[in-house]
């Protein structure tokens, strides 16, 4: 059977593009350029793998620059007002009388970064294991709770 020329089906070139025998359900003509349904919907966390995290756009405090940096918009940064501490009823978890830990590096010119001090600390760790500092073992300033 010989195929019929297209001029017998349509009168103009625009009508040649349409397929009047294929229509959408609402009556629009189908031009063959789209597929059924929208395939470009946003990806959800249920569709991604276990490492996918989208977030909720809750903490966007700035913007990315085109050079890979990040500029913070200080109007979007959260600020918290602390209450006045005079006659404040809530108490801290840590006792206010706890002495601060002070590290002394006598005989080491580089302070905490001196290689001789690091070597000495490694030797002590090998011999004794992990040992708390003297200030941390002072239990006289501890307050028993409960």
Swiss-Prot record:
- Note the SS bond partners: none
What cellular component GO annotations does this protein have? mitochondrial inner membrane; mitochondrial large ribosomal subunit; mitochondrion
**Where does the transit peptide start and end?**
1-16
Q: What top-level branch of life does the organism fall under?
A: Eukaryota
Pfam families (UniProt xref): MRP-L27
Which controlled-vocabulary keywords does the entry list? Answer: Mitochondrion, Ribonucleoprotein, Ribosomal protein, Transit peptide
Q: Name one GO biological process term.
A: translation
Molecular-function GO terms, alphabetical: structural constituent of ribosome
Q: Where in the cell is it found?
A: Mitochondrion
Residues in coiled coil: none
Q: Which PANTHER family match?
A: LARGE RIBOSOMAL SUBUNIT PROTEIN ML41 (PTHR21338:SF0), MITOCHONDRIAL RIBOSOMAL PROTEIN L41 (PTHR21338)
Subunit arrangement? Component of the mitochondrial large ribosomal subunit (mt-LSU). Mature yeast 74S mitochondrial ribosomes consist of a small (37S) and a large (54S) subunit. The 37S small subunit contains a 15S ribosomal RNA (15S mt-rRNA) and 34 different proteins. The 54S large subunit contains a 21S rRNA (21S mt-rRNA) and 46 different proteins.
Its annotated function is as follows: Component of the mitochondrial ribosome (mitoribosome), a dedicated translation machinery responsible for the synthesis of mitochondrial genome-encoded proteins, including at least some of the essential transmembrane subunits of the mitochondrial respiratory chain. The mitoribosomes are attached to the mitochondrial inner membrane and translation products are cotranslationally integrated into the membrane.
Q: Which family does it belong to?
A: Belongs to the mitochondrion-specific ribosomal protein mL41 family.
Q: What else is known?
A: Present with 2250 molecules/cell in log phase SD medium.
Could you tell me what this protein is called?
Large ribosomal subunit protein mL41
Query: Where does this protein come from, organism-wise?
Result: Saccharomyces cerevisiae (strain ATCC 204508 / S288c)
